[in-house]
Regions:
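Secretory targeting and sorting signals
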Residues: 1-29
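Right-handed parallel beta-helix/beta-spiral solenoid domain characteristic of secreted/periplasmic
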Residues: 30, 34-39, 71-124
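Acidic Gly/Asp/Thr-rich repetitive segments characteristic of extracellular carbohydrate-active
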Residues: 31-60
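Parallel beta-helix/beta-solenoid
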Residues: 49, 69-70, 78, 111, ...
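Extracellular beta-strand solenoid repeats
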Residues: 55, 66, 75, 84, ...
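Extracellular beta-strand/beta-solenoid scaffold signature
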Residues: 88-107, 123-130, 146-155, 169-190, ...
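Leucine-rich solenoid repeat scaffolds
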Residues: 307-353
Length: 353
């Protein structure tokens, strides 16, 4: 049997502490399905009901896991629980797509309340975690590293919480949130989604928010990427914007990434706004991001690849030092962008510090 079901009341979740997760919150579940090394996480998920927890003990699990059950929690044992690609290609749709964990709903019925916690996902050709058509998704204490494209990818989703994760050495973004991962269209209202407390390093770009609205990115650390944070929009409507980028540490994102069909070379980019509106960048510490790309510098405003301008954005009360070619760079022709109260030395054009 792939898992053992333990019927229990919520109060008995103290048993989680016995497997080294004393700091985890109480299990809000009707049942716990325990998965040990050599067993299948997917089999446990397939047996689970809404409200259940799949508790995965230490070990390496060579599989992809597809979740369609609402209000399900998958909880590992920290970095000792590792999900890697299956030895034999194929399997479910998640495996066929090159993903580690998929949380998949539909446009008519988003899958709600799924939590993924305290595990590592590594080595997949595309994304460690791929979420589509979800509501109130929670991903926390996850290590997503050495994946071909994104560490954590969330599209067509509302009210997600991505917190206290580590995303390292992924081929594209460490954390990616978008209206669509492929395709265009107007910006999605994320309904106050949150990306917070994450450590994002050695990716192409640390955090990408593409064609979304009403998202907060705060208290994250981005270092060693080609670029720290990219907020991306275009001329489509609704326009991307109404984001808050605050209280982040964006340090020495000086890895070199070659140009592609949409973007020039990326190196030394701290926080980049391209084609967005009414976004606030405040109280961040942005230091030592240096390069010679048009996107290089501490905080950079740059037109979108389709020419869509930035407009109505506020850059205030940031510490931006030792960035190059400038700490603050306004390379846009959009209207209503303001720079106030920033601690910096060099701006382009002059007068922004």
């Amino acid at each position: 049997m792939a898992a053992r079901r333990f019927h229990q009341l919520v109060g008995t979740a103290v048993g989680v502490a016995a497997v080294g997760l004393a700091a985890a919150p109480p299990v809000q579940a009707e049942s716990v399905l325990l998965v040990s090394k050599g067993q299948s996480i997917q089999e446990a998920v397939d047996r689970a009901k809404p409200g259940d927890t799949v508790l995965v003990l230490p070990g390496t699990y060579q599989e992809s896991v597809r979740v369609t059950v609402p209000h399900l929690t998958i909880r590992g044992s920290g970095d000792r629980t590792v999900i890697t690609p299956p030895a034999v290609p194929g399997g479910n749709a998640c495996a066929a797509g090159g993903y580690g964990i998929c949380v998949t709903g539909t446009a008519d019925q988003p899958v709600a309340g799924v939590s993924i916690e305290s595990l590592a996902v590594s080595g997949f050709t595309k994304h460690a975690i791929n979420a589509s058509d979800t509501d109130r998704l929670s991903v926390r204490f996850v290590l997503a590293q050495d994946n071909g494209q994104y560490g954590i990818s969330v599209e067509k989703s509302t009210r997600a919480r991505l917190s206290m994760n580590r995303a390292r050495n992924n081929g594209q973004a460490g954390i990616f949130m978008a209206n669509l991962t492929s395709g265009e269209g107007g910006a999605l209202d994320t309904e106050s989604a949150m990306i917070s407390g994450n450590d994002v390093s050695a990716n192409r770009i640390g955090v990408v928010a593409r064609r979304v609205r009403n998202l907060t990115v705060e208290n994250n650390t981005m270092t060693g990427n080609c670029g720290g944070v990219f907020v991306v929009g275009d001329e489509g409507t609704p326009r991307a914007g109404a984001l808050s980028i605050r209280l982040n540490k964006v340090v020495a994102n000086n890895k070199f990434c070659p140009a592609n069909s949409r973007l020039p070379v990326i190196q030394g980019s701290g926080i980049v706004l391209t084609g967005v509106e009414n976004t606030t960048v405040e109280l961040n510490r942005i230091t030592d991001n240096v390069g010679t790309s048009p996107l290089s510098g501490g905080v950079v405003l740059f037109p979108s690849f389709t020419g869509g301008p930035n407009s109505g954005n506020t850059v205030k009360d940031n510490t931006a030092l030792r960035n190059g070619p400038a700490d603050l760079s306004d390379r846009d022709t959009g209207l209503g962008n303001t720079f106030n109260g920033n601690h910096c030395l060099v701006s382009a054009p002059a007068g922004r510090c």
